[in-house]
UniProtKB/Swiss-Prot annotation:
SUPFAM superfamilies: P-loop containing nucleoside triphosphate hydrolases (SSF52540)
Named cofactor requirement(s): a divalent metal cation
Function: Catalyzes the phosphorylation of 2-phosphoglycerate to 2,3-diphosphoglycerate. Involved in the biosynthesis of cyclic 2,3-bisphosphoglycerate, a thermoprotectant.
Pathway(s) annotated for this protein in UniProt: Thermoadapter biosynthesis; cyclic 2,3-diphosphoglycerate biosynthesis; cyclic 2,3-diphosphoglycerate from 2-phospho-D-glycerate: step 1/2
Annotated EC: 2.7.2.16
GO molecular function per UniProt: ATP binding; kinase activity; phosphotransferase activity, carboxyl group as acceptor
Keyword Transferase: yes
Catalysis performed (reactions): (2R)-2-phosphoglycerate + ATP = (2R)-2,3-bisphosphoglycerate + ADP + H(+)
Organism whose genome encodes this protein: Methanothermus fervidus (strain ATCC 43054 / DSM 2088 / JCM 10308 / V24 S)
Lineage, broadest ranks: Archaea, Methanobacteriati, Methanobacteriota, Methanomada group, Methanobacteria
Boundaries of every ATP-cone domain copy: 2-90
Family membership noted in the UniProt record: Belongs to the 2-phosphoglycerate kinase family.
Origin: domain of life: Archaea
Designated name of the protein: 2-phosphoglycerate kinase
């Protein structure tokens, strides 16, 4: 039996080498599942050939990296990036922002899966909880969508202001209280989590939270309006979907204004902007940015 030796809280532990576990980690780094299992089997054969009884995690990572490099250097680099993020000691709070329809939900799910983060929540869910606690009479904008919040404005916006954005900001200001509470709780409990949704707007979350080394924010955009509009057709065609297509199309003009505003805020606050055209490219961009940002900010935070 081959044992893998690692460390947790400074204490060594050993566990049996598993092709399945290794294959899963390779898949999360972007490798095809079949190829991942074949490589895991190849690594096992190599360890047996070398008569290894005990192999440290660092040694195993090096072996895997070298074998990956022989086959595909890009996958090898992705694997190392994934390992660096996984080895980060602090909980990772990942915020995926963007207007309705740009794909924050699907990207958040895929990124969470890639990084092995089990906790994920949408800002829509946070808003729904807050709606149960705060009446429509008290804060009417909370009981509207992001793109219809302007309808609830008690005082009409001045002509020089965009009423859609005035309503949106009012709506986001309230939901941000709940978002910050989730972030604070995750930091306190040491829980990694992915939060996604249109209520995540650069400049609204307190700087003391957003500037933490282990909190990362990304803004997704879809520059082409036709492509953005087409996303709603695919989003609403599922039988389980409860969101009417007509409603999104009716207010698409407002959604685009919010889309551009979030992008503008991202540029203003130096938040990474990713054009979400291709899912794989978007995920790779997020993972690469995370390693460059988190790893280089504080190398002392890593195990080893």
């Amino acid at each position: 039996m081959i044992l893998v030796e690692g460390k947790v809280a400074g204490k060594k532990y050993r566990e049996p080498f598993s092709k399945g576990v290794l294959a899963r980690s390779l898949t999360r780094s972007g490798m095809d599942p079949t190829d991942a299992y074949l490589l895991a089997a190849e690594v096992e054969s190599y360890l047996k050939k070398e008569k290894k009884k005990i192999v440290t995690i660092d040694e195993l990572v090096k072996i895997v990296y070298n074998k990956l490099k022989e086959k595909d250097e890009k996958i090898a680099e992705k694997y190392i990036r994934w390992r660096k993020i996984r080895e980060y000691k602090e909980p990772l709070i990942l915020l995926i922002a963007g207007a309705s329809g740009v794909g924050t939900s699907s990207i958040a799910f895929e990124v969470a899966n890639r990084l092995g983060i089990r906790n994920m929540i949408s800002t829509d869910m946070i808003r729904e909880v807050m709606r149960k606690m705060i009446s429509k009479e008290l804060i009417p904008s909370l009981h509207e969508s992001t793109f219809t919040a302007y309808k609830s404005l008690r005082t009409p916006a001045p002509v020089e202001f965009d009423e859609v954005l005035v309503g949106f900001r009012d709506h986001v200001n309230v939901v941000t209280v709940g978002i910050e509470a989730v972030i604070e709780r995750a930091l306190t409990e040491g829980i990694s989590i992915v939060i996604e949704g249109a209520h995540l707007v650069p400049g609204f979350i307190r700087e003391e939270l957003i500037n933490k080394n282990n909190v990362a924010m990304f803004v997704l955009t879809v520059p082409d309006e036709k492509m953005h509009r087409s996303r709603f057709y695919s989003r609403c065609r599922q039988k389980w979907a409860r969101r009417p297509l007509e409603r999104y199309l009716k207010y698409f003009w407002a959604i685009r204004r919010i889309h551009d505003y979030i992008e503008m805020q991202a540029r203003k606050h130096n938040i990474p902007i990713i054009e979400n055209i291709d899912v794989v490219t978007t995920i790779d961009s997020i993972v690469k940015s995370l390693t460059e940002d988190l790893v280089h900010k504080d190398v002392g935070k890593y195990k080893g």
